[in-house]
Amino acid sequence: MELYNGERPSVFRLLGKYMRKGLYSILTQGPIPTHIAFILDGNGRFAKKHKLPEGGGHKAGFLALLNVLTYCYELGVKYATIYAFSIDNFRRKPHEVQYVMNLMLEKIEGMIMEESIINAYDICVRFVGNLKLLDEPLKTAADKIMRATAKNSKFVLLLAVCYTSTDEIVHAVEESSKDKLKSDEICNDGNGDCVIKIEEMEPYSEIKLVELERNTYINPYPDVLIRTSGETRLSNYLLWQTTNCILYSPHALWPEIGLRHVVWAVINCQRHYSYLEKHKEYLK
């Protein structure tokens, strides 16, 4: 017998929302992380564990992602970065790669359809990584949602696609070198062409740290990095940015992640806040 005549889920959702508000009011008595990064590990193992059809783990993982992003938004976290697809993932079986690409395209197109809702919540969506490696439909869709949400600022969702940290560092060095070269160029007023006056160039022009960091894909640096499945490897993710970052590795597979894991990550960050702030000053 249906006691609530189909309304029970909405009642429980409402109750859960108020309970979260109470929990957040306690957590916000301490510092809240500005930026939380995630490695979504365990979708495949979750599918095997529950005998799901191919792709079932990724679909369950997407639902978990929506919940986690909701918690971050409600808690007042400003930035969330998701390791959505590594360049190294291209080494997987072609049909697996294509499935993930199709799923990403489907979800991005879904975001485009819900553009008004995303803008109402003031959410900015940014794709970061070597986006030239994406196929044209996916690249076009990503560009469309980025342009549509570019002016939003309350919550910034960074999706690392076709990303590895080593590729990012190479990109940052290349762009910094180009910037350095441009600073040595002097425009000829006669025809507008730029020439380099060798005699006026410095014999050694180093790239400064601030210049390199300006050309990385992902800023600001994360305060907490959560990797599910109990793994502590960074897997070529944010190697440059995690010098001063808490690593939290719950044993839950990614589709099993919940509010308690996000809360515990925030508490860990608060416990080590003083040390992390001192370390930041030391690194300056």
UniProtKB/Swiss-Prot annotation:
Tissue and organ expression note: Predominantly expressed in latex.
Top-rank EC class of the record's enzyme: transferase
Domain of life: Eukaryota
GO cellular component, one term: endoplasmic reticulum
Positions annotated as active site in the UniProt record: D41
Keyword annotations: Transferase
A biological process from GO: polyprenol biosynthetic process
Gene Ontology terms for molecular function: ditrans,polycis-polyprenyl diphosphate synthase [(2E,6E)-farnesyl diphosphate specific] activity; rubber cis-polyprenylcistransferase activity
EC number per UniProt: 2.5.1.20
Disulphide-bridged cysteine pairs: none
Catalysed reactions, semicolon-separated: (cis-prenyl)(n)-diphosphate + isopentenyl diphosphate = (cis-prenyl)(n+1)-diphosphate + diphosphate
NCBIfam families in the record: uppS
Protein family (similarity comment): Belongs to the UPP synthase family.
Functional description taken from the UniProt entry: Proposed to be involved in rubber biosynthesis as a particle-bound rubber transferase responsible for the cis-1,4-polymerization of isoprene subunits. Probably requires additional factors for the production of high molecular mass rubber.
Listed name of the protein: Rubber cis-polyprenyltransferase HRT2
Gene source species: Hevea brasiliensis (Para rubber tree)
High-level lineage: Eukaryota, Viridiplantae, Streptophyta, Embryophyta, Tracheophyta
